[in-house]
């Protein structure tokens, strides 16, 4: 054993796992994130994987990565660069080293750096460390061989044994961060409950990786420890945005006293919501995997008519197909939540990458005057709140609502404090009053202009809804010009009357020289950029929007308060254009990227500083 290891105390650290898309890097990263969140650290994760089901082994295009930022206190992003890089093959080292700090510790499986591996990764020599000019601490271990040695008496074949390589790497990283392996053991025994031999093999390999680090660490300068500084007591868990979204819908249905119906068609990156909700039939959840996107949305409209909290989920291409059924819900004035987990486009585009390019589509991408509330979740944990709020708006205002997330928020995870349902407000749909029995008409409204909801089967409230325009007074089909104009106004006024919270200004809200504006899943990166600039003595504030339509009442006041405003978004300026349409005389600076990747905080700081200095 080498000399006593120095334990370095850190407030935050970034770890990136990388390897072939079949090497289990997503599982290893998720499990390490769960361990960290469970012990009280804050986390922010970024799964980054190719669209291929299984890319050619060892290819540069087939590398799958998972980055997690762990903090003693609050962290806002997965981090620009990592402190520890796990590269399970030559291609991973070649493509992922750019994400490593100059001081990073690098872990490689030398068994996957053979001549053929190096050729696939376009290395020109047999020494990739020297060729790339890497001066970092490197743990170069024959991981594949050690895994096979560890499981030699397991009875597993060679291929099955090598599937455990990710657990060896996880054990080694857990050693680097002084993590207890108990949580990982429990997770694996639960995951492989029907295959206990597989669970125990993986557990054995995790311990082998941990022990290897403990006993053979002469090439590493130090290990790390990140203490928890969590100030809010409670039970925490690591949760992805998609899972939080599913839980938010379940909570809303419970508070409304309704069944939850999801009509969906599988599409990356939204499918996990369908998977999660399908596990909860005992909570009154009904899920239907339909034959296509159109059927998914149309069936949800039918479920809404029947009296359920109805949801349909998709990504950008699916919104194109669902638009007709969404418009049907608009004219029928039925509650519906449409979840759009945005991805790179247009067309099939970049299915596993993230953008904010669906904003104008969900605002205006339907025929006719078709007003619809739009919300955008700001983080993985905020997906729970946003799903609840979208459901509440839909049910209480009898309207379809679009909830925007994106691949970064949906697949990423964060430490989430389990909420108490009693702390959330009741949801009160505008059910038709019993005293209107016999005199009620389908488009009769309450004092807020919201159509009453009559559930089929109620005696005295038989009615028909449909896609043809209806007479406001009788509910009969009408082509009367004045009536159509009136109904168009009533549908718009109903949306305009929805009360949403004011947009909050953070940072130097009283005297900022630059206001950063964003919406949805870019919140963490923009907040981190603001923090860095303020630490340098610059006067900067942030206004981040969750409610897009209707906009908060104080939007114009905030936009006009500061001498310079920059709107930063992952599209070519859709939100900036929307704000210009809504706020007279508003001419902001713009920061636009459409790379399929999250913002890089250092690049944001440089761009915002340049604007500030103009």
Question: Where do the protein language model's features map onto the residues?
Answer:
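Active-site cofactor/cluster-binding pocket
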Residues: 2-256
């Amino acid at each position: 054993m080498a000399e006593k290891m120095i334990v370095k105390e850190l407030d935050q650290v970034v770890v990136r796992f990388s390897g072939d898309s079949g090497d289990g890097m997503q599982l290893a990263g998720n499990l390490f994130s769960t361990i960290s969140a469970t012990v009280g650290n804050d986390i922010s994760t970024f799964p980054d994987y190719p669209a291929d089901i299984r890319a050619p082994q060892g290819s540069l295009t087939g590398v799958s990565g998972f980055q997690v930022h762990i903090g003693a206190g609050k962290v806002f992003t997965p981090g620009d660069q990592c402190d520890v890089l796990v590269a399970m093959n030559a291609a991973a080292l070649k493509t992922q080293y750019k994400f490593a700090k100059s001081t990073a510790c690098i872990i490689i499986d030398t068994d996957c750096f053979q001549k053929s591996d190096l050729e696939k990764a376009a290395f020109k020599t047999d020494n990739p460390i020297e060729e790339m000019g890497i001066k970092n601490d490197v743990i170069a271990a024959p991981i594949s061989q050690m895994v096979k040695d560890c499981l030699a008496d397991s009875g597993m074949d060679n291929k099955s044994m090598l599937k455990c390589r990710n657990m060896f790497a996880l054990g080694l990283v857990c050693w680097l961060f002084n993590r207890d392996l108990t949580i990982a053991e429990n997770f694996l025994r639960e995951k492989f409950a029907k295959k206990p031999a597989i669970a125990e093999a993986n557990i054995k390999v995790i311990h082998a990786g941990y022990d290897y680090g403990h006993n053979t660490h002469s090439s590493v300068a130090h290990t790390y420890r990140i203490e928890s500084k969590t100030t809010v007591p409670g039970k925490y868990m690591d949760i992805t945005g998609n899972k939080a979204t599913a839980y938010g819908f379940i909570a809303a249905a419970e508070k409304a006293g309704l069944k939850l119906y999801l009509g969906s068609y599988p599409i990356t990156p939204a499918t996990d919501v369908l998977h999660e909700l399908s596990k909860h039939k005992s909570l009154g959840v009904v899920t239907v995997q339909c034959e296509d996107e159109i059927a998914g949305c149309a069936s949800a409209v039918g479920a809404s008519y029947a009296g359920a909290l109805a949801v349909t989920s998709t990504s950008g291409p699916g919104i194109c197909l669902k638009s007709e059924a969404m418009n049907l819900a608009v004219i029928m004035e039925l509650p519906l939540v449409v979840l759009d987990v945005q991805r790179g486009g247009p067309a099939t585009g970049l299915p596993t990458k993230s953008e904010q390019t669906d904003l104008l589509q969900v605002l205006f991408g339907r025929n006719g005057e078709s007003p619809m509330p739009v919300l955008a979740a700001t983080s993985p944990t905020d997906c729970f709140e946003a799903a609840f709020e979208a459901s509440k708006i839909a049910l209480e205002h009898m309207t379809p609502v679009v909830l925007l997330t994106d691949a970064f928020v949906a697949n990423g995870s964060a430490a989430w404090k389990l909420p108490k349902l009693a702390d959330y407000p009741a949801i009160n749909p505008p059910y038709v009053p019993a005293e209107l029995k016999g005199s009620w008409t389908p488009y009769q409204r309450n004092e807020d202009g919201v159509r009453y909801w009559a559930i089929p089967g109620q005696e005295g409230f038989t009615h028909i809804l449909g896609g043809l325009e209806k007479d406001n007074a009788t509910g009969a089909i009408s082509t009367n010009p004045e009536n159509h104009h009136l109904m168009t106004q009533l549908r718009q006024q109903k949306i305009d009357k929805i009360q949403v919270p004011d947009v909050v200004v953070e940072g130097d809200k009283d005297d900022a020289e630059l206001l950063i504006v964003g919406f949805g899943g870019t919140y963490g990166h923009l907040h981190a950029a603001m923090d860095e600039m303020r630490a340098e003595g610059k006067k900067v504030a942030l206004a981040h929007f969750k409610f897009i339509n209707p906009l908060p009442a104080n939007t114009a006041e905030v936009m006009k308060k500061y001498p310079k405003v920059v709107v930063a978004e992952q599209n070519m300026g859709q939100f900036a254009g929307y704000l210009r349409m809504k706020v007279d005389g508003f001419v902001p600076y713009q920061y636009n990227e459409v790379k399929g990747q999250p913002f890089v905080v250092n690049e944001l700081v440089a761009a915002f500083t340049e604007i500030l200095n103009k």
